[in-house]
A protein has these predicted regions:
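Short Gly/Ser/Thr- and Asp/Glu-enriched loop/turn motifs at secondary-structure junctions
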Residues: 119, 414, 542-546
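C-terminal tails and terminal domains of large nucleic-acid-associated
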Residues: 517-553
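Short glycine-rich phosphate-binding loop at a beta-alpha junction
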Residues: 89, 384, 547
Length: 553
């Protein structure tokens, strides 16, 4: 019986972000991508979300390397956290590694990591894997699909891709290489599902330039343009077209400044002589000659654009006559934040251009016709829709079945599923631990951690603090309990009444405990929490977090 090829996603299935896929053959492992996700609104105080890599820790001696598809943080952003535990070689294209190295340097890890540059022409062996790459178009330059040839068959991972026939840098998705792989025979394809609910084909990045020309021609004041800092092609178009219209540009936002400098130094960004000025110099130029490139297209509260909108930016004060262009689509979950920013910008007197009908954004992901084309080119025996919410995976799985693939050859995986593939069969044979790890300041914690639950409870129901002073010898109450409430009980009179009733209820229970000679700190804390929690719920239908403080004298 032949050894199976095993595919184990630890992130990126049924969700947007934290993409990380384990590929295993003959007891050896390569990892494709190592991404993070950004916290949802209910993840209070959380900075970042990482995939749980418990499985990789348990197999770290078998891991041969991490292969990166491209330079977006949902595909490489977890590297500084993962490499602390599993320090293995990292492979990626030139720009992808430049972004990754900058992130590693921030964490003091750059000198500790074995980093290897590859391109679409690279081919090498990692244990039982013959590793190759295919050039693909995406919203960040230098993106790659990954090809793993094994004795059992070939795996192709699309990464994020689309078929752009007129890309800004002239680097198209290599359909000839994909077709050759299809002719050779592909055992399994993992493909980007993000736009499986979008009919037709994704538009070319160059289309955005037409809208930019019109905006710069019509704008009488400054143009402030927000986009993803990694969308170097978008930034290139903005710089080039602004220059044609007689405008210089400045850059605002830490990640935008960093990525512009990296891309310029590596030759991915062409800046005309004299076109770039410092942000501190913008007052030296008339408004009609200025473009300001900024972060904040997702309405992030601390981003440069949000600070402009709320009149909190140290260099850029919003002025009537400004034209603000939001050249990005809100990531699911960010819609409210983006609209709040738009509202503030409009109140500040700016003209705001955003939304699909304006032509200022095209997606970097394959739509349904593109996905159908990839399936027809690669002709996989087994197909795994990846990188998307369940609805995206479902729709792309349905697309594969429409293309003639048998039902049992199209598999929708969940994070942690262990898919075992032989030449004739693919089935989930096991499950490993996979979930979310939260980055909270300098700490890492699991999604189930009590800290996060406490924050959610505080936000939803408030807190009740009870200070009880008792005799250490007898357990008798030495003073009336002090009870304070925050985050509920809005009416002052009702609040006073409820808290007094709560004190009376608590005193009665504490007297019972004293008569029974129960004086242990933990037992008293549990009783105080139970009595107050039950009483407050009965009187208010709220369940605040009860924090008992026992003072023994």
């Amino acid at each position: 019986m032949s050894r199976p090829l095993r595919i184990i996603p630890l992130g990126g299935m049924g969700e947007i972000g934290k993409n990380l896929t384990v590929v295993e053959f003959g007891g050896k492992i390569v990892v494709i991508d190592c991404g993070l996700a950004f916290p949802r609104d209910e993840m209070l105080g959380i900075d970042l979300v990482l995939p749980d890599i418990s499985y990789l820790r348990s197999r770290q001696d078998d891991i041969l390397g991490i292969l990166l598809t491209h330079g977006h943080e949902d595909h490489f952003g977890a590297l500084p956290f993962v490499l602390r535990d599993v320090n293995v070689p990292v492979y990626g294209s030139r720009l992808t590694l430049a972004f990754a190295k900058s992130k590693l340097d921030e964490h003091g890890l750059l000198k500790c990591v074995d980093i290897n540059e590859v391109s679409e022409s690279s081919r090498f062996r990692l244990g039982p894997f013959d590793v190759g790459f295919v050039a693909v178009s995406h919203s960040v330059p230098d993106s790659l699909a990954i090809v793993l040839r094994t004795p059992l068959g070939t795996l192709v991972h699309s990464g994020d891709y689309k078929f752009d026939h007129t890309p800004i840098d002239g680097r198209i998705t290599d359909v000839n290489s994909l077709a050759r792989l299809g002719d050779e025979g592909v055992l399994v394809l993992l493909a980007d599902s993000t736009n499986a609910d979008v009919e037709g084909s994704s538009g070319s990045e160059s289309q955005v330039g037409h809208a930019f020309h019109q905006i710069f021609a019509e704008a009488e004041g400054r143009v402030i343009m927000a986009s993803f800092a990694s969308n170097i092609h978008r930034i290139q178009q903005a710089i080039h077209i602004a220059h044609l219209h007689g405008r210089v540009f400045a850059v605002s936002g830490r990640s935008m400044v960093k990525n512009v400098n990296i891309s310029r130094n590596l030759g991915y960004l062409d800046v005309p002589e004299g076109a770039m000025i410092r942000l501190t110099e913008i007052d030296d130029y008339p408004p009609e000659r200025l473009l300001i490139l900024t972060t904040g297209s997702q309405g992030e509260p601390l981003s440069a654009l949000s600070r402009m909108a709320y009149d909190d930016h140290p260099q850029v004060a919003l002025e009537p006559g400004d034209t603000v262009v939001i050249s990005a689509k809100p990531v699911p979950g960010n819609e409210v934040s983006v609209m709040n920013t738009v509202n503030r910008l409009l109140k500040g007197g700016a003209r705001v251009i955003y939304g699909p009908e304006t032509g200022v954004h095209v997606s970097g992901h394959a739509a349904r016709e593109d996905q159908r084309m990839l399936l027809n080119l690669v002709k996989p025996r087994f197909f795994l829709p990846a990188h998307g919410e369940y609805r995206h995976q479902y729709l792309q799985a349905d697309l594969a079945r429409q293309a003639g693939m048998p039902d049992d050859h199209v598999i929708i995986l969940e994070n942690g599923d262990v898919l075992s593939i032989t030449p004739d069969k693919a089935e989930v044979t096991d499950k490993v631990r996979a979930g979310m790890v939260y980055v909270d300041g300098l700490e890492l914690g699991s999604a189930e951690h009590v800290v996060v639950r406490d924050r959610q409870r505080l936000a939803e129901n408030g807190i009740l603090i009870a200070v009880v002073t008792i005799s250490v010898q007898t357990g008798e109450l030495l003073a009336e309990p002090e009870i304070e409430a925050r985050g509920f009980l809005y009416d002052d009179d009702f609040r006073t009444q409820v808290l007094q009733e709560a004190r009376d209820e608590l005193v009665e229970r504490l007297q019972e405990l004293a008569s029974e000679h129960i004086t242990g700190q933990r037992l008293l804390q549990e009783d105080v929490s139970e009595v107050l929690g039950r009483f407050i719920h009965k009187r208010t239908r709220r369940q605040p977090l009860v924090l008992p403080v026992i003072v023994e004298v």
